[in-house]
Amino acid sequence: KPYTTFSDVFSKVKGKIPVFNRKPVIPVFSNRYSKIDFTQTDFDVELIRGRLKTDPDTAFFWSGRTDGIGGMDVAKKIAKNKGGVTLESTIDDTNIVMPEWDFNTPSSVTAWEEASNVYAEQVSGEIRAVVGSELRPGNIWENIELPRLKANPNVTKITTIDPKTGVEKIIFER
């Protein structure tokens, strides 16, 4: 029998609807977005443009490492601790499956460059970036994201954060 109400779902799963302060708790499903899987179809940034928008003052970027410390996971952690999001956490939260980053697969590099570009053009307010002292030549931060952020009239300030020391430095202010 298909589940038709929240009560049906919770009666099967938990035995009752959860209650807080004597009021039923309405469950919120974890992802309201339908899955877009770019490992199964050609990348089209227009399909995800709307999903890559962020609230003002919440966008984080990342690039490079300092003494081996840095990368996506460190940036996600710092962003979360400061109430922000990264491109990757936004992608995860909106049910997008991107191709794995691979220098040897030009379509992978292009997909990530396009997603980064759209993310950077839609952010607003104060932007923070976890940027290490060791950056790969041709990195997306210096070549795509930073120029796009500086050209974005809705960006008021860009602050970098060293992934090892946590030292913050304002690099752009409007």
What positions do the PLM features span?
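Catalytic toxin/effector domains delivered as secreted proteins or via bacterial secretion systems
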Residues: T4-R174
